[in-house]
Amino acid sequence: MSTKNEQLFAQACKHIPGGVNSPVRAFAGVGGTPIFMHRANGSKIYDTEDNAYIDYVGSWGPMILGHAHPKVIDAVKKAADDGLSFGTPTPFETTVADKICEIVPSVEMIRMTSSGTEATMSAIRLARGYTQRDKIVKFEGCYHGHSDSLLVKAGSGMLDIGEPTSKGVPADFAKHTITIPYNDSQAIKDCFEKWGEEIACVILEPIAGNMNMVIPSQEFHDTLREQCTANNSVLIFDEVMTGFRVGLGGAQAHFGIDPDLTCFGKIIGAGLPVGAFGGKKEVMSCIAPLGGVYQAGTLSGNPLAMRAGIAMFEDLTAEGFYDELAVKVDRLVDGFQAAADKHGINLRTNKLGGMFGMFFVTDGDTAVPQNFDEVTECDMEVFNTFFHGMLDRGIYLAPSAYEAGFMSIKHSDEDIDTSIKAADEIFAEMAKA
């Protein structure tokens, strides 16, 4: 780690809590000093000394076209020339809304927000208003942003600091949140048998990306849909991470499930601050000004993010885009797995579309983790060694064993081969240790 980077971190710590503006950036889970970046292009990000790193974080998912995509940058520049924010409706919001509703059949109406957290928070308020019920169901290890009712046994950065439930969340608030095991169909049935008439909604990541990457069973999703329908509870898919990432139609298209509401994140604005929630017209009509559930935001649907999103969707909807992306992920993940197998390293992997997960399990008999408890049983020290080894070789992975990885369309065969070679070297060193 360079002295300059340590100086930057020390300077940041003076006025920024922990030196970062989002906890996972602090390297708390992996140790060491976070690297300060100052620019990015294509598949690479560059630190303040202009060292290049092949990036598999992609701003936590949205940089599916690669960093600084010319079409997106041009759209943002033109938008900025026309004014940054108006506080009025714009035609660009309608264009993005129309495009999302066209792509995702379950979304009949949609409301823009400024973040994924706002989207999930608003979707839950809407579900409560629509059903006139208070209780919500979430799953262990699923992260839905930092609103109070959702920071109960959450994944992502909460796990890195060893606090699965945030301090500062009143007990009276948390009592309305029921948390059950992920990928457990019987737990869903038991939950509805006990509280069915009180449950406003169930919210989940349809593929969990904040306890690494856990792909649940089809039975799990079928059971969720059946139970929510039978009990008149709203099914909310948090596709902030998976939407337009695991496929054009998101995880709901992969599983063939139509949720009642869906939440999206900054990918719809090509990485700029934006989110959205949408779904059935009957439910969405309860939002003000049509209904009595209030939600608002000065920068919701801001023109910079909307025009960036319009440019991005032109590429995402091109024929073969997601096939090409999946080929890149297959090449990378299969290469990692082959290298680990060669050196006797207990690696398990998951992948779908442009998203992947890596788990260092504790023995050769352990399968790919299927839930929160199994993920937490993985060997975090081995991951930390792997993370820093890759970082030293110019490969940037998420600085946490609880986060998924992301591929962009700009990652080249050379990038992928370089990454596999680096992993092979690290696994060889591990095998000798």
From Swiss-Prot:
Pathway: Porphyrin-containing compound metabolism; protoporphyrin-IX biosynthesis; 5-aminolevulinate from L-glutamyl-tRNA(Glu): step 2/2
Keywords: Cytoplasm, Isomerase, Porphyrin biosynthesis, Pyridoxal phosphate
Catalytic activity: (S)-4-amino-5-oxopentanoate = 5-aminolevulinate
GO BP of this protein: protoporphyrinogen IX biosynthetic process
Known cofactor(s): pyridoxal 5'-phosphate
Cellular component, GO annotation: cytoplasm
Enzyme's top EC category: isomerase
InterPro entries per the UniProt record, alphabetical: 4pyrrol_synth_GluAld_NH2Trfase (IPR004639), Aminotrans_3 (IPR005814), Aminotrans_3_PPA_site (IPR049704), PyrdxlP-dep_Trfase (IPR015424), PyrdxlP-dep_Trfase_major (IPR015421), PyrdxlP-dep_Trfase_small (IPR015422)
Localization annotation: Cytoplasm
Pfam family, one: Aminotran_3
NCBIfam families attached to this UniProt entry: hemL (TIGR00713), PRK00062.1 (NF000818)
Quaternary structure, from the entry: Homodimer.
Name of the protein in question: Glutamate-1-semialdehyde 2,1-aminomutase
Organism: Psychrobacter arcticus (strain DSM 17307 / VKM B-2377 / 273-4)
Lineage: Bacteria, Pseudomonadati, Pseudomonadota, Gammaproteobacteria, Moraxellales
Recorded name of the encoding gene: hemL
